């Protein structure tokens, strides 16, 4: 016997096998559930445009993409994921994407930003779950997404100079993080990781050029570094620098912010 039902984006097939022992007139029943998901596997999601205006998403699926991938014949390339599921592509170019996990709906999602929208896209069939009006509790007066980042238990969003950080367990973005009103993120560059705080704090570091100091954050709380006058490098008194890149270093632990050669290469 077999019965099927659609739960979210998964097809649940419940099978039952009955075996009859005719010698003793006994029936043995075995039940199991088979979950069938979408045809898309793990891979690299790429945003692209064909006409310079609209944009879409493609998925390159290959078990060893970064080591041996050498063309479509080595794996599967799925194109026009947004158009095929939603009826049309994004109306403008994609500016940022972030892969993360939605604890509320218990599914993997993509945050996708364009010049005038911020969307959540599920990764089974690439259906658009919501737009900027759904993403923000209070829609900002201006949408200018500069960064989308994974931090510890949170998603961090830089929009028009404001710092937002929302828990993975919350489906919507509220207001800018309290205490960050006077902070600015130079060039929108942040070094961030999502490791547990028991192993690595802080989860974010950035440079505030207006204050001339470095700032750091963890779990929706941000601080400006205090001055350390006796140190060769004073993170609380470092005016006139510019930040051009940031990330976690090759040791998979150290926050790194890259400054122009004329200043220095700083590791905080």
State where each predicted segment sits:
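Short acidic/polar inter-strand loop motif in beta-rich domains
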Residues: 22-24
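Preference for solvent-exposed, low-hydrophobicity sequence contexts
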Residues: 107-267
